[in-house]
Every structure is written in structure tokens, then in C-alpha cells.
């Protein structure tokens, strides 16, 4: 077996020391939290737990990369393939739900109850058990582990695993054939997905027509490939100093729902928010593509802000106004203190074939004059954009995001925007009087840029 070079040994030693220190810190922190009143646990305490957990996982990933070789990589891939197949098999026969939540049962009784051959069941249990999923506390006897029990109490976890086995994996394996046949096509029916299923229907249409598939896709996006939900992004944005704005107006541009606005309105009672819905650049792959019924009640097809129906006076809803506005239309609100601009995460296949980056550049250019006149601020949520290569402390987080990006390509010939492309677009946004500049980057505990703060800067 090839050895590790001297610089590799130094890195290995440093990672092992960091891992040891972080594990001790994590254990000490968790003990402090568990010994205190859980109801009084602060958000900072939970954030610190997440941070130390991420550091531990990053160190483990780095150590594996330093020690691993071709054999270790192939063995790990072979194991993961079979784990995915086993999860699909367990879901097909609803075996997890048959195992008592407390205690366990004999494998033979479980096989009889599920109607499967006991020899197959035993093999599956013993493989997934190597990953802490189910256990055999005594020969031929099975019980849940804390990990496997969660797949019974939360159907969404199992939905994600089933989608991975039934669609994500087969589709990914058809990528070479799709490239041979379709080249660089962006048409939504010329994809690896269409070849894998031998179907002419776009994936985006399939998840709209089949609710179960749509549910599984949403679960896969959020649990397996790290798509940040709007509530989580809103939690991150809440770290900004919104209370300093007083009774100012905030305009959310290019929104797909009102969830972020309501979150901010609930948390900051002096804010007034105008939500500008833009479905023209929405992707059908977005789980929020179908409009919630409560949002439709307040949606109008003109550009005059309309409050949502029958809000209680003084409530958060009374301070949230919903309008419809596409990116190509002039911004009617030119005196807001803050504009939250949602850039199109996906390079959607629009009828006109418009490029997402050109849309972003045009919209950024439009805000030059507005920000110059008002000294306002432009916020761009970026949690779901692809991070700069190598910029995150945990490489697994970047791997998860890039897995999601390839899923979009293989399923629908779509793709996510790179942070580097957005930085380039901002850098070139200027006119004869000034330019847009980034004044702050709000980052998560792993170094992910979740929001950019921009303002207009006049030339000296």
C-alpha cells in the first residue's frame, strides 16, 4: 500500500489533534446543555453545537481523504450502492414499521409478518447494521437503533431514500448515454431521466401530476441534497439589524412565496414588507412551484400593493402586502429602505431561452439608480447558490450542493448558479456615476455565504 508523504503526515497529525479537541468540546457542550433546562436553551447554544459537529465531520472527511486510496474509495462506493438498495427494499415491504419501537423481535417472525424470505431479510439487516441502521442485539433477533427509528416516525426521511433509489441513482447512471445522444441540449425532455424511464414527459411535469413523486422529490431536496428552505434562510437573515430600520418599507423581489416576509414581520413588529411574486422565472423543480392557497387570496395581477385578505389590525399579516411583478417590469417601489432580491437559482428553460445570468445582470443594473437616490440597501440571499470551490470548512457541504446541481442537470437539464458568477455580475454593475459594491457577507458556521449586502458607491 502506498505510504503518505511527509506533508500528508503533518496534515494527518494536525487533523487528529483538531478532531480530538473538538470532540472533547462537543461532549462538554452537550453535557452542559442536557443538564440545563431544555426550554431555556439559547439559539447560540444550538448554533455552537452545530458548529462543533460540522468541525468534527469535516475533520473525519479530511482524515479519510488523507488515508484513503483507490481500494477504499471503491469499497465505500460499493457499500453505499447496497445500502441504498437495502433501504428501498425495506421501504417496499414496510419492514421498518413492523419492528416494535421498543424491544425487538425475531428475524423469522419479522420475515413472516412482512412476507419476505428470511434469508434475504437477515442479509439486509446485517448490512445496514454496519451503518448503525437497525441492529441484531442477539443472533437472529432485530431491533431499531435511534437512527432507524427516525425513519418510522418521520415518513419524509424514507421518501428521500426511496427517491434516491428509484430515480436519482438510475438517472445519474444514464448521464453518459444522455451525453452521447443529446450532447449539450437544454431541452427538458432530452435528459438522462427520460432515458432512464424511457419517457417523453419532462420531470418537472411528472412531479406536478404525481403528488407522491412530488412529495418524495421535495424530501430528497431538503434531506439528501441540502436545499435550504425559506424559513431557514429567513432565520439566517434575522441576524441582520432589522430593528434599526424602524417603520421602513422592505421590498422582497422575485419571491416564490410569502413565508420569508411573514417570518420577518413576526420577528420585527415595525417592519412593513411588500412581496413581489415572480412566477415567470420559477422552475417547476422548485417544491414551492405550486402557490399556497392562502397566498392566492392576496395575489393581484397589477402593480398596486394589496394587503392579504382580512388581516387582523396590528398583526404581522397586516404589514405584509403581496403583488405580482416580473423581472422585466419597472420597479414601482422606489423609496424602500431595503430590497431583498431573489436571483433565479436555476437556469430555467424559458420559452425565450433567456439566460439566467443576463436576467440577473439586467436587474442589478436597474437597482443602481434606485439605491443611488435612496441610499438604500440591496440584500441577495445566496444560501442555495453553489459555493466557491474549496471555500467551505467542511467539504461534504460543497459535495452535497454539487450533487444537487448534477441532479437538476440529469433530471431536467437545469443547473444552479455559481457564487463566482454572481460575484462577477455584481462587479461589472456600474454606470457613469457609480457602481454596486458588496459591503457585507453573512456567513453560516461552515463558511457558507447565505446573504450579500450591497449598496451604491459613487465614484470619487
From Swiss-Prot:
Disordered: region residues: 300-320
GO molecular-function terms, A-Z: DNA binding
Domain HTH iclR-type: 74-145
Gene Ontology CC: nucleus
Origin superkingdom: Eukaryota
Keywords: DNA-binding, Nucleus, Transcription, Transcription regulation
Record flagged with keyword Transcription regulation: yes
Biotechnology note: Notoamides have been shown to exhibit antitumoral activities. Notoamides A-C show moderate cytotoxicity against HeLa and L1210 cells with IC(50) values in the range of 22-52 mg/ml, but the IC(50) value of notoamide D is greater than 100 mg/ml. Moreover, notoamide C induces G2/M-cell cycle arrest at a concentration of 6.3 mg/ml.
DNA-binding region: 107-126
InterPro entries associated with the record: SAM-dependent_MTases_sf (IPR029063), WH-like_DNA-bd_sf (IPR036388), WH_DNA-bd_sf (IPR036390)
Location in or out of the cell: Nucleus
Physiological role: Transcription factor that probably regulates the expression of the gene cluster that mediates the biosynthesis of notoamide, a fungal indole alkaloid that belongs to a family of natural products containing a characteristic bicyclo[2.2.2]diazaoctane core.
Name of the featured protein: Notoamide biosynthesis cluster transcriptional coactivator notR
